[in-house]
C-alpha cells in the first residue's frame, strides 16, 4: 500500500488505536500521531507503532523560541519518527533551529526526519486570517510567503491545502514537499475544515502526501475505505 497516503490516528488513547489497527494486520501504514494521542500516551505510542512496522508523522506543530524548538526536535528525532512539523509563523531562526535539533538527535546511520512547516491551518478562512490574525494579504499570498520562508530556512516542505499546491510548485519548485490534510471522500461531511478536497483532486493538483482521517477511521469498514482512498489517490485499481 502507498506510503504517500497518511492515515490520521485521531484517537484519544492507545486502546482505540489498537482496535483500529486490527483492520490492517500485516500492512505497513504511514500514520499521523497528533497532540491528543501523543499527550495522552507519550513516547510509548511511538514505540508501539514502530514495532508494528508503521511510519510516523508526529504532528505537534512546534512553535516556540529557537532554542526550545531545537531541544524538542532533538528529542523527537531520537524517537525515530519519519516526519515532524513546526509553525512557519515561528520564523526562520526557529525553523533553522528545528533542523539543527533533528540532525543532532537522529539515530545513527539514519536520515533525519522530514521536517515541514504549517503555513495556515486548513480551518483558516481568508476572512478569519485578516480579521483575527491580522495578516493583510490574501490567503494565497500568505501561504506562498510562508512556503518560501520555509524553503529558505532549510525545511523540506509545508502542510497546505491542495488548492495551494500549484502556486507553491511555482514558488518553491517541484521537489518541495506538500503535505495536504483536509482530504475527504466526496460522500463525507466537511466537518471543521474549510479548505478540503477529494483524493483524486489532490492527485490532480500535485500533492506529495495526503492526510486522511475520518473518511477512514470512522468508516464502517476502515480497510475498504482505505483502499477506496488509495484508488482515488493513485488512480489505480486495488
UniProtKB/Swiss-Prot annotation:
Active site annotation, chain numbering: 61
InterPro entries to which the protein is assigned, alphabetical: Aldolase_TIM, OMPdecase, OMPdecase_AS, OMPdecase_bac, OMPdeCOase_dom, RibuloseP-bd_barrel
Keywords, in A-Z order: Decarboxylase, Lyase, Pyrimidine biosynthesis
Pathway: Pyrimidine metabolism; UMP biosynthesis via de novo pathway; UMP from orotate: step 2/2
Reaction equation(s) it catalyzes: orotidine 5'-phosphate + H(+) = UMP + CO2
Molecular functions per Gene Ontology: orotidine-5'-phosphate decarboxylase activity
Binding residue positions for substrate: 10, 32, 59-68, 122, 184, 193, 213-214
PROSITE patterns: OMPDECASE
The keyword Endoplasmic reticulum appears for this protein: no
Membrane listed as a keyword: no
Pfam families noted in UniProt: OMPdecase (PF00215)
Gene Ontology cellular component list: cytosol
GO biological process per UniProt: 'de novo' pyrimidine nucleobase biosynthetic process; 'de novo' UMP biosynthetic process
CDD domains associated with the record: OMP_decarboxylase_like (cd04725)
EC number: 4.1.1.23
Annotated PANTHER family: OROTIDINE 5'-PHOSPHATE DECARBOXYLASE
Family the UniProt entry places it in: Belongs to the OMP decarboxylase family. Type 1 subfamily.
Subunit structure: Homodimer.
Annotated NCBIfam families: PRK00230.1, pyrF
Summary of the function given for this chain in its UniProt record: Catalyzes the decarboxylation of orotidine 5'-monophosphate (OMP) to uridine 5'-monophosphate (UMP).
Protein name per its UniProtKB record: Orotidine 5'-phosphate decarboxylase
UniProt organism field: Bacillus anthracis
Amino acid at each position: 500500500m502507498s506510503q504517500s497516503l497518511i492515515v490520521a490516528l485521531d484517537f484519544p488513547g492507545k486502546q482505540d488505536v489498537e482496535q483500529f489497527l486490527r483492520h490492517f494486520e500485516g500492512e505497513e501504514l504511514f500514520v499521523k500521531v497528533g497532540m491528543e494521542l501523543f499527550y495522552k500516551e507519550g513516547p510509548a505510542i511511538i514505540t508501539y507503532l514502530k514495532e508494528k512496522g508503521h511510519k510516523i508523522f508526529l504532528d505537534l506543530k512546534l512553535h516556540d523560541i529557537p532554542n526550545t524548538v531545537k531541544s524538542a526536535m532533538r528529542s523527537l528525532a531520537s524517537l525515530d519518527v519519519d516526519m515532524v512539523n513546526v509553525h512557519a509563523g515561528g520564523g526562520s531562526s526557529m525553523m533553522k533551529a528545528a533542523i539543527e535539533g533533528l540532525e543532532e538527535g537522529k539515530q545513527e546511520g539514519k536520515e533525519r526526519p522530514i521536517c515541514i512547516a504549517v503555513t495556515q491551518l486548513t480551518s483558516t478562512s481568508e476572512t478569519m486570517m485578516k480579521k483575527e490574525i491580522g495578516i493583510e494579504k490574501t490567503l494565497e499570498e500568505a501561504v506562498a510567503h510562508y512556503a518560501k520562508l520555509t524553503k529558505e530556512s532549510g525545511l523540506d516542505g509545508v502542510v497546505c491545502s491542495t488548492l495551494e499546491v500549484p502556486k507553491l510548485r511555482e514558488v518553491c519548485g517541484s521537489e518541495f514537499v506538500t503535505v495536504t490534510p483536509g482530504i475527504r471522500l466526496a460522500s463525507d461531511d466537511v466537518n471543521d475544515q474549510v479548505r478540503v478536497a477529494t483524493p483524486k483532486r489532490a492527485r490532480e493538483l500535485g500533492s506529495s502526501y495526503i492526510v486522511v482521517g475520518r473518511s477512514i477511521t470512522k468508516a464502517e469498514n476502515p480497510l475498504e475505505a482505505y483502499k477506496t482512498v488509495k484508488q482515488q489517490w493513485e488512480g489505480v485499481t486495488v
